[in-house]
Regions:
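Extended alpha-helical scaffold/coiled-coil
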Residues: 1-151
Length: 151
């Protein structure tokens, strides 16, 4: 990966291995920065999902398992991005309602795991706030599934 080292766009560039610590740190920051979905186009959301996958793939080699806080936070970001993208694809006719609802059901299962992992964090901490937001996401998704039964 080539990383531009200056903000002014000059040509001072260095090559890093895609799994280098600094590259992974950059990916982590990009994942966080791609948070306001209404401002993002579909390709940027896809990029965020890809960054999440890359981050999980590399860090799972260092700190294996899917019960770690870094896994939970990254999966939270990934699932939210996937849901936004799925909604847009559904709206444009790219997937069926059945496929969309299947994806919602899968997301709920992952969100439940995320909430379990992060709910043990100290009250008032950033991770505990994400657990609370995850609970809200689960509730919204379950409401969506209930409403879909009437259509």
């Amino acid at each position: 990966m080539i990383v531009n080292l200056t903000e002014d766009g000059s040509s001072k560039k260095m090559k890093f291995h895609p799994n280098h610590y600094l590259v992974m740190k950059l990916k982590s920051h990009l994942i966080s920065q791609y948070a306001i979905y209404r401002n993002l186009d579909d390709n940027t959301i896809r990029r965020k999902i890809k960054l999440c996958d890359e981050f999980i793939n590399v860090f799972s080699k260092i700190d294996s398992g899917d019960s770690t806080d870094w896994w939970a936070i990254t999966m939270y970001e990934k699932i939210r991005a996937e849901m936004v993208l799925d909604q847009r694809i559904l709206d444009s006719g790219g997937i069926s309602m059945k496929e969309f609802l299947d994806n919602v059901r899968k997301s709920i299962e992952v969100w439940k795991k995320i909430m379990t992992i992060l709910s043990i964090e100290p009250e008032g901490s950033y991770l505990r706030k994400i657990a609370s937001q995850t609970k809200q996401e689960i509730s919204k998704a379950q409401d969506l599934l209930l409403m879909a039964q009437f259509f």
